[in-house]
């Protein structure tokens, strides 16, 4: 019952049941609010639960090795001192040489994106097409929303359970798709 997978499922249930509701309410706010009226209002599901999910997405985007390099650099720079979300993302960028400027929107934009996934398989051409789109509904604090950077991990299997290598235009591609447009 205490397995990693079961814990992950429980965390996702908390996110969907509580944090998504907070993100859709008049209390919606970004992970990194511009201002805090009352310090107790800062400790919310958005700051902690959604913030943790954003860090998991950075891990998915960068991969284990680059994420660990980023963590090491972050601790070297900020151990024992106050640090910000921007400090964390900067360490990840510097360690991996990956531009995360688009990804930073997760910290400044409130709301939960609605992700739509459509798939189609053509048996004649043996081609599988995946179409992913996103939109984030307006929130009281932000009427206009920008598309977020969503790393989308995917793996396909054949009838025998073997991994099918992903290709785009006949060339191998990474199993993490980067959704950056609406």
Enumerate the language-model features and the residues they cover.
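Beta-strand-rich binding/interaction modules
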Residues: 99-102, 110-182
